[in-house]
Amino acid sequence: TVDSASMVTESGYNKEENTIDTQAYTSTILEESADAGESYIDETLFLGDSNTARMYRMFDYCSYDNAIGSVGMSARNLATFACVQLSTSSSYVTMSQAVAKLQPRRVILTFGTNDLNPSYKAADFVKNYQAGIETVVAAYPSVDILVNSIPPIGQQHSNQSLTQTQVDEYNKALVEMCQEKGWKFLNSAEVLKDAATGYAKSGYVETSDGIHLTRSAMDALFNYIRTHSYITEDDRPALTTIPKHTGDKDAVTYTVPVVSSTASTEEPVSSESEYIEDSSSSEENVNYVEATPTPE
């Protein structure tokens, strides 16, 4: 739990500065659709950080069958961090390798909160994120790629490295990346943001940290996902036996090489570390804890 005295605020935030011109990205940003229902959620694989982990570990919006979340994980780790355990092996695999085994129709990726850092520019963020997504596509070419916006933070939050200004900058860069690569952008931030302030709506982030999404926010998010659906012809090859997702590895600190031309290679401090218990591992410079499904 974070003491309220340690909460920080951002000065000089201009909510209009990095507004996404939705008219310029009509073929990329998912438009409102009829409600695609729970079946759409069930056939989607959610990949992300702690807000994705909360979808199935804390709440019941998805399950271990269709979601993989690693607390503290950043987009730059997507290609290399072995954080997924499947029933076919005792070893951990990367999310990309897991996608190839789980064979979903589509993936929705939600990363970026743990990349936020004043020294890490948007251009370098998307360069590394794109490289990670490309490993997903290479592992399972039939999958549809939907990149979700980074959720807004509260006006008061617990990590001084985070600003809503940079969240907006990153999201604007993500739309451009998706348009260039032919991927779809799920602009869910528009339903999570308070239009008057540009920050998360009241009650949509935990008061203890101003970062993690609450059940109310998840309700709004999943309604948005179902009503901004992307359903294409199912061109997957004949499915092979699909293993069970049996466990996750949560990253506290994970250092990887960064593709960078303009930014420092300093690893951002995880905005999620207060939610995990520190333990150490000699493997791949990772401190982690493991999460497994609750036995039925």
Residue ranges and their predicted role:
Residues 1, 29, 34-39, 54, ...:
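Extracellular glycan-modifying ectodomains
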Residues 2-38:
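Non-catalytic propeptide/linker segments at domain boundaries
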Residues 40-43, 103-107, 140-145, 181-184:
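Loop/turn elements at helix/coil->beta-strand transitions in domains of secreted/extracellular proteins
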Residues 110-114, 136-168, 190:
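Active-site segments of SGNH/GDSL-like serine hydrolases
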Residues 1, 7-14, 219-296:
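Conserved catalytic region of serine esterases and O-acyltransferases that act on ester linkages
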Residues 153-259:
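Catalytic His-Asp segment of secreted/periplasmic serine-dependent ester chemistry enzymes
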Residues 34-127:
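Conserved SGNH/GDSL esterase-like catalytic core that processes O-acyl groups on lipids
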Residues 122-132, 167-170:
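Charged helix-capping and loop-helix junction motifs
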